[in-house]
């Protein structure tokens, strides 16, 4: 197999996890990292074990050894960087959101199709083996027809008024904060696991902390601490949301997202209730799958390759009792993306494990629709 060269644009919180995941594949070279200056690019390249460091993404795109561009920049740069990479004929792995707006995301869908390259979005919770087990169980009909889905995605890293991130700045993060950042994950997970599509939403959003102390220095997401030098800024985006949803089979659903919920570090939960049984997966207990019954004892299926169905077994790499985690799921997604790249042109379609640009566009559209609904006083809004 020919070696594939990877280049990373954006080395903040999630960027190093991209590098770690593709390095584990064994057939990918970490060629380059782009920073905002030559000095920062070189420093980040050395820290991540890349061969080259560049002071701009444009310089990285000019490197013929870079075949795949990983876009882990702040949201406002997603469209610009991805569009430029596609124009150079590079494969692209983009963090979500695909773009700041659904209109931009749709343009990227079209640009990727014209480029004829592999283009994926990192909805990484698809990569968990128990998520794939849930998808298999539901597709087999073990739950019966789903009629209700509910859940949440709760965090507490923005609970204090001294907590700040670029995600709270609409010019960098976009028109949504909590919904775009984590609510999009819940929606993708619900649709991926069930095969259903969200068709209508009704949103109620709130900004709990309306003024925050913005450090004059930079700070990554989830980074604690305060700064003596701050600027008090008005917050215009939501940090809490409650959403009702309807699916294309007539099922109903509801979910809540919030980043001001004390004690919830990364609490993503989805439950699917069907005509025969129910099923629940929770990210903070991600090696288990709860299955609920009416006429017999409920079950908790622990992650064990010998107990999983074929559709999930290949994504569990350790024996039962050996826990797998967030980074392992991320690597599973990257493995499927790079298998398609390694296959060569004409490149095969991405498998369900890996989210497409079309999936990314749909995620943008759902978030936009929830914001539209909330602005309209909580009216049902079609996707």
Model-derived segments and their meaning:
Residues 107-124, 144-148:
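Rossmann-fold dehydrogenase core element
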Residues 89, 116, 141, 250, ...:
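Glycine-centered short loops/turns at secondary-structure junctions
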Residues 125-235, 289, 377:
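Predominantly a Rossmann-like dinucleotide-binding segment in NAD(P)-dependent oxidoreductases
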Residues 1, 8, 68-70, 106, ...:
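C-terminal helix-rich "cap/oligomerization" subdomain common to oxidoreductases
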Residues 206, 210-249, 270, 276-354:
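C-terminal glycine/acidic-rich active-site capping loop/insertion
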Residues 1-48:
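N-terminal Rossmann-like dinucleotide-binding module
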Residues 15, 54, 71, 94, ...:
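Hydrophobic residues in well-ordered beta-strands that form the structural core
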Residues 39, 48-111:
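Beta-loop-alpha module in the N-terminal Rossmann-like domain of NAD(P)-dependent dehydrogenases
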């Amino acid at each position: 197999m020919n070696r594939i060269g990877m280049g990373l644009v954006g080395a903040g919180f999630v960027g190093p996890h991209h590098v770690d995941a593709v390095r584990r594949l064994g057939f990918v070279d970490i060629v380059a990292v782009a920073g905002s200056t030559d000095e920062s690019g070189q420093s980040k390249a050395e820290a991540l074990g890349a061969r080259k460091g560049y002071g701009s993404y444009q310089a990285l795109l000019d490197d013929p050894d870079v075949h795949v561009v990983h876009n882990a920049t702040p949201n406002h740069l997603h469209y610009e960087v991805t569009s430029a990479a596609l124009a150079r004929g590079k494969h692209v792995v983009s963090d979500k959101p695909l773009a700041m707006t659904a209109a931009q995301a749709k343009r990227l869908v079209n640009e990727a199709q014209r480029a004829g390259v592999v283009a994926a979005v990192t909805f990484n919770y698809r990569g968990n083996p128990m998520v794939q087990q849930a998808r298999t169980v539901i597709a087999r009909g073990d739950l019966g027809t789903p009629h209700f889905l509910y859940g949440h995605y709760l965090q507490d890293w923005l609970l204090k008024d001294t907590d700040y991130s670029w995600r709270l700045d609409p010019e960098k993060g976009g028109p949504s904060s909590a919904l775009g950042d984590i609510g999009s994950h819940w929606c993708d997970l619900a649709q991926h696991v069930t095969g259903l599509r969200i068709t209508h939403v009704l949103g109620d959003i709130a900004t709990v902390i309306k003024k925050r102390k913005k450090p004059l220095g930079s700070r990554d997401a989830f980074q604690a601490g305060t700064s003596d030098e701050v600027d008090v800024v008005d917050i215009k985006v939501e940090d809490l949301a409650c959403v009702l949803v309807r699916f294309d089979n007539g099922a109903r659903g509801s979910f809540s997202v919030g980043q001001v919920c004390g004690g919830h570090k990364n609490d993503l939960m989805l439950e699917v209730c069907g005509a025969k049984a129910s099923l629940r997966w929770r990210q903070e207990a991600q090696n288990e799958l709860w299955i609920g019954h009416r006429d017999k004892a409920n079950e908790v299926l622990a992650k064990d390759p010998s107990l999983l169905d074929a559709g999930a077994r290949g994504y569990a790499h350790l024996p039962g009792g050996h826990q797998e985690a967030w980074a392992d799921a991320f690597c599973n997604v990257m493995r499927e993306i790079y298998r398609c790249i390694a296959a060569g042109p004409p490149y095969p379609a991405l498998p369900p494990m890996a989210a497409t640009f079309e999936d990314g566009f749909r995620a943008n559209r759902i978030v936009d629709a929830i914001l539209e609904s909330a602005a309209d006083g909580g009216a049902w809004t079609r996707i």
